[in-house]
């Protein structure tokens, strides 16, 4: 990610049970994980304090345990879910590149490995809020709390609510409006679906 520092983890070996074939999920096989964790390391670099960074040993332990505890048919699903779990677990990580290699992929031909690499990050989104029915403030506050409850969203800031006159000539009550900023792992259409 442009403008951010990165912590690199290359070739973390994990024995896990992912695959389409029953033997793969029953017997298991070796997987190799490589990650680029995108964050600012400036405070950690100036202060020499681990608390200002991300402990890459803990990330490795977490990823190993996560891949061992879950089973997916596709390495695409294993990569997606593990990357999401890392981003949710460590708030300092703004994004990551996650590669999952399957060196023993059962394709029946000589190959070094099969892999999937994904890039995931937190996105900033702005959501407008408004109501002119019933307990307007309660509706808006309920919407904010519903967004706070979404695991893939972090509400960053909520504006004050202001009252505005309706527009368009239709006889109706005044609106109570506001806006909020949130960071989300969801893609735009996924966020719209959650808001719907």
Q: What are these model-predicted stretches?
A:
Residues 1-125, 131:
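N-terminal, polar/charged subdomain of small-to-medium soluble alpha/beta proteins
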């Amino acid at each position: 990610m442009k403008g951010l520092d990165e912590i690199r983890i290359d070739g973390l070996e994990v024995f896990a049970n992912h695959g389409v074939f029953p033997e793969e999920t029953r017997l298991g096989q070796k997987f190799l994980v490589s990650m680029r964790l995108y964050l600012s390391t400036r405070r950690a670099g100036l202060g020499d304090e681990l608390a200002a960074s991300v402990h890459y040993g803990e990330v490795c332990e977490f990823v190993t345990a996560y891949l061992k505890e879950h089973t997916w048919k596709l390495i695409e699903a294993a990569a997606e879910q593990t990357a999401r779990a890392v981003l949710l677990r460590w708030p300092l990580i703004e994004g990551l590149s996650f590669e999952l290699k399957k060196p023993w992929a059962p394709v029946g031909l000589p190959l070094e490995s099969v892999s999937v690499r994904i890039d995931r990050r937190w996105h900033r989104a702005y959501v407008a809020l408004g109501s002119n029915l019933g307990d307007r403030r309660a509706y808006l506050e309920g919407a904010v709390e519903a967004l706070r409850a979404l695991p893939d969203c972090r509400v960053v800031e909520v504006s004050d609510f202001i009252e505005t006159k309706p527009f368009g000539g239709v006889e109706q009550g005044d609106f109570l409006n506001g806006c909020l900023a949130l960071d989300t792992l969801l893609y735009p259409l996924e966020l719209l679906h959650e808001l719907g």
